[in-house]
């Protein structure tokens, strides 16, 4: 076993004798990991791992101080990374030197297992590093035959049992066990000038027996069983003379390559030995860690990164660097290998001690958490619930499309793997019938298909005809695809643009049972078509007369003020582009706001097999559909009521988006030519409501335009309606006009419609999206600068904390530990497993402690306490920071918006402003 630990060779599985294994004592895992180092964590038995022969060769070279020579035969059948099943892990320690190493039994996966569409990718075991211990590097006086071992005061008080200070001098006897179970007795005394903690009697015996020298380290651990454990770490001193019994370096290299190649070809088990103190890097890593780093973290030359390194006395430190290149380490022998494929340059002058090349899974790019790209450009504010219908299909090429950034020489086999257990592709989760929740997914699929003008992706023409309400305020008047193309293409010459968009259209789902029932009901309405047309014409004429008579009574200055207000809210009509532009009737709109006529003029459509409806029949149909799409009617040109009614929690989501036009000059010239002849296109169309969520207003004035994409269309963040948020959040002089509004295409005199009066003022949204309370709008605008930040921890209620009370990270961690019952665990996150992250003002998620304190105070928005389990499951990006645990009472609307604007840890995908589902 000593040969195995020092050489790190590969042996067939049969070479490990069961009798020899039984003779090995069960080592203490906590003490073994402490001796191995703070960054070492062995994978879990039974999990899938990735084995790198290159890394194994580096361990042999480091142990023998001899690199692998070129005359060593190559094994073309041995891939640069081998996915294996980890069958067994045994921890060992050398009997003479206490050098720790691990024996692992691996078995390569068969080709059939690699093709498994749901290949498990376990996250591996938790880091078994101890939490209550101290490590000290020995000095010359510590290793001398007199004087004893000086223990730092805080370390002695933390790890050793308390002294009895009634004695003079205070003293006690300590009994500590090493890795082999041997007990060592020391006398612990508190004496001297100044007084200090010393280990006297028994210490020199221990130093002599272990042959410790200055530079070596000693660890004392107080475990959960109230036992004192003792371990040593020897300084990395290169061996000048290898024992004659040890095999040559070339023999070791050939042995490990031959054993791995044979196991890969025969799908048999093989055994390796991992020496964490001698190996430069881990060469057996969990499969999930490999996939997350290689296929779900985007890097580029020039990107900044940080990397953890072990420092003195078992502590760790992050060193900064810059990526200078991405290439194979040994393209001739190991092509397409990800082992040390990243060239880096280190910032500090001591960079000579660190490797010039690193692997992807060893570094942390200075961005948000790793990106999990989706084939659809819509980024959800909340995790997509399991079973809810998604806006895209779960095709096999969805995963591969997100991996196009990889080098062309990358192994395509890994791209076909679906790691569903990590939550990397939520669209692959099982779904149930959306009608159980009262949803109408097909209506949204139809809208998306209509927007891109792909008739093959549409559910049915009859569903499009359901989208023909009569009221202008927040209603849509949708045409069939053939009629839309006839109207739009001659005007805007968009054939090539639509052809490109058709390639990215979304597949619609089958019609829901609800729509089929409503269609059957509406078929009976067609028999009453003449009567309904007559009634509709009478209602329209009466409504027109009432509007004109009321508008005559409005003073002229009030009309001008009303038009001015409507211009301010130009960006917030109930419109959805591009199909708001593609769904106009074939008649022009009036020129003034006071004489607006309804769009719902009778039109005829070709009959379909399911009895298509004319617009005159839709009034009765909307009464039937009202429970699922309840909107209070918009009153055009009516005075604003003083009493604001409480909005319906099922009120529709309304968004206003920019027009899909090639360029401003081209559109302006075209609009001037079409001013007198082309029909005016309404900019209002309604999107049927999704239950339980309301649109939010993006209050960030410096929004990134890439953060507002819906169906591939840029959305102006200021044009998103919030239930009750517009009057309080927008001033009268804040003009947010839609682009191209200077042309006749979106002239204010033609398309200024008042907002729906059912929107209340400054209504507060709770976590479920409903409106439980109402607050004064002045409280939203004139809210004093907040010095409190929200702190969240899973399983408990959130807390508010004034961070200006503290002057350092240590005080903050201590206070958070007291508030959440985590005393002593937040100060040492790497040992306890608990981690602190925060969201800054730019919605980036960062680790607490990396920035200067004052910069952190000025930029922090909220803090999240992550448990060890959450830190383990960082591969599930949609679960972290997506929502605060517990119900937070009394929050204002802007607090709610700021929480929803926080980006999650796994995602990194551009936000869609305030669109929520």
Curated annotation (Swiss-Prot):
Source organism: Oryza sativa subsp. japonica
GO BP: any one term: regulation of DNA-templated transcription
Entry keyword ATP-binding: no
Residues making up the signal peptide according to the UniProt record: none
Function: Auxin response factors (ARFs) are transcriptional factors that bind specifically to the DNA sequence 5'-TGTCTC-3' found in the auxin-responsive promoter elements (AuxREs).
Chain intervals for the UniProt region annotation (Disordered): 571-649
Protein name (record): Auxin response factor 17
Primary localization: nucleus
UniProtKB keywords: Auxin signaling pathway, DNA-binding, Nucleus, Transcription, Transcription regulation
Gene: ARF17
Localization per Swiss-Prot or TrEMBL: Nucleus
């Amino acid at each position: 076993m000593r040969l195995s630990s020092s050489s790190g060779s590969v042996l067939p599985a049969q070479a490990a004798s069961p009798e020899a294994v039984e003779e090995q004592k069960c080592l203490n895992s906590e003490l073994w990991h402490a001796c191995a180092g703070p960054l070492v964590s062995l994978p879990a038995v039974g999990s899938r791992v990735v084995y790198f022969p290159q890394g194994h060769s580096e361990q042999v070279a480091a142990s023998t101080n001899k690199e692998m020579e070129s005359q060593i035969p190559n094994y073309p059948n041995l891939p640069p990374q081998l996915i294996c099943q980890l069958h067994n892990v045994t921890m060992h320690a050398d009997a003479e030197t206490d050098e720790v190493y691990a024996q692992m039994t691996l078995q390569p996966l068969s080709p059939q297992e690699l093709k498994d569409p749901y290949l498990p990718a376990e996250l591996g075991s938790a880091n078994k590093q101890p939490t209550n211990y101290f490590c000290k590097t020995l000095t010359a006086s510590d290793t001398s035959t007199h004087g004893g071992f000086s223990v730092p005061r805080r370390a002695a008080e933390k790890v050793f049992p308390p002294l009895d200070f009634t004695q003079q001098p205070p003293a006690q006897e300590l009994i500590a066990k090493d890795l082999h179970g041997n007990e060592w007795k020391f006398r612990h005394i508190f004496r001297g000038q100044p007084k200090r903690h010393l280990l006297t009697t028994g210490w020199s015996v221990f130093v002599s027996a272990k042959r410790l020298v200055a530079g070596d380290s000693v660890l004392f651990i107080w475990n959960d069983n109230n036992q004192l454990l003792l371990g040593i770490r020897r300084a990395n001193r290169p061996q000048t003379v290898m024992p004659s019994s040890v095999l040559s370096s070339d023999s070791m290299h050939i042995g490990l390559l031959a054993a791995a190649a044979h196991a890969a070809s025969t799908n048999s088990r093989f055994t390796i030995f991992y020496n964490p103190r001698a190996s430069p890097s881990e060469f057996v890593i969990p499969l999930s860690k490999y996939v997350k780093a290689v296929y779900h973290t985007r890097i580029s030359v020039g990107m900044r990164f940080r990397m953890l390194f072990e420092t003195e006395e078992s502590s760790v430190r992050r060193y900064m660097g810059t990526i200078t290149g991405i290439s194979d380490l040994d393209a001739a022998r190991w092509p397409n290998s990800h082992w040390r494929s990243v060239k880096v340059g280190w910032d500090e002058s001591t960079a000579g001690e660190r490797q010039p090349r690193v692997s992807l899974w060893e570094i942390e790019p200075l961005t948000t958490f790793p990106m999990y790209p989706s084939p659809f450009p819509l980024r959800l504010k909340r995790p997509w619930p399991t079973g809810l219908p998604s806006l895209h299909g779960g095709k096999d090429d969805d995963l591969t499309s997100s991996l196009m950034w990889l080098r062309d020489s990358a192994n395509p086999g890994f791209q076909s793997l679906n790691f569903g257990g990590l939550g990397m592709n939520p669209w692959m989760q099982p779904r149930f019938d959306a009608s159980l929740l009262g949803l109408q997914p097909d209506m949204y699929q139809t809208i998306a298909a209509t927007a891109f003008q792909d008739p093959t992706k549409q559910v049915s023409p009859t569903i499009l005809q359901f989208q023909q309400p009569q009221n202008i305020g927040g209603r849509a008047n949708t045409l069939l695809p053939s009629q839309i193309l006839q109207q739009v293409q001659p005007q805007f010459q968009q054939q090539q643009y639509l052809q490109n968009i058709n390639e990215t259209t979304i597949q619609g789902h089958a019609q829901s049972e609800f729509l089929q029932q409503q269609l059957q009901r509406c078929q009976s309405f067609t028999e009453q078509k003449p009567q309904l047309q007559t009634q509709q014409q009478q209602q329209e004429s009466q409504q027109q007369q009432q509007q004109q008579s009321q508008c005559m009574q409005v003073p002229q200055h009030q009309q001008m003020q009303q038009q001015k207000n409507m211009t301010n809210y130009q960006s917030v009509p109930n419109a959805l582009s591009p199909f708001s532009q593609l769904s106009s009737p074939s008649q022009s709109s009036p020129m003034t706001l006071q004489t607006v006529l309804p769009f719902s003029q009778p039109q005829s459509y070709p009959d379909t097999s399911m009895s298509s409806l004319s617009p005159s029949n839709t009034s009765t149909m909307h009464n039937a559909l009202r429970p699922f799409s309840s909107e209070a009617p918009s009153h055009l040109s009516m005075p604003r009521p003083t009493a604001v009614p409480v909005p319906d929690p099922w009120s529709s989501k309304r968004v206003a988006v920019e027009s899909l036009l090639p360029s401003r000059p081209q559109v302006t010239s075209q609009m001037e030519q079409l001013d007198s002849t082309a029909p005016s296109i309404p900019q209002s169309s309604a999107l049927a409501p999704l239950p339980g969520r309301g649109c939010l207003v993006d209050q960030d004035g410096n929004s990134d335009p890439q953060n507002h994409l819906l169906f591939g269309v840029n959305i102006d963040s200021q044009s998103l309606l919030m239930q009750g948020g517009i009057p309080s959040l927008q001033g009268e002089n804040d003009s947010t006009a839609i682009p191209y509004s200077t042309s006749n295409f979106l002239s204010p005199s033609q398309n200024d419609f008042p907002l729906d009066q059912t929107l209340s003022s400054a209504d507060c949204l709770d976590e479920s999206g409903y409106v439980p309370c109402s607050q004064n709008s002045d409280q939203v605008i004139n809210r004093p600068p907040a010095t409190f930040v929200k702190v969240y921890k899973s399983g408990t209620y959130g807390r508010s904390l004034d961070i200006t009370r503290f002057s350092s990270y240590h005080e903050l961690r201590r206070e958070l530990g007291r508030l959440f019952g985590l005393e002593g665990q937040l100060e040492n996150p790497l040992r306890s497993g608990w981690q602190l992250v925060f969201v800054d003002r730019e919605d980036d998620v960062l680790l607490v402690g990396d920035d200067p304190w004052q910069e952190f105070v000025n930029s922090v928005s909220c803090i999240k306490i992550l448990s060890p389990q959450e830190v383990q499951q960082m591969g599930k990006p949609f679960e972290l920071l997506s929502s605060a645990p517990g119900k937070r009472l009394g929050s204002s609307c802007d607090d709610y918006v700021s929480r929803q604007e926080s980006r999650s840890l796994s995602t990194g995908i551009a936000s869609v402003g305030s669109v929520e589902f």
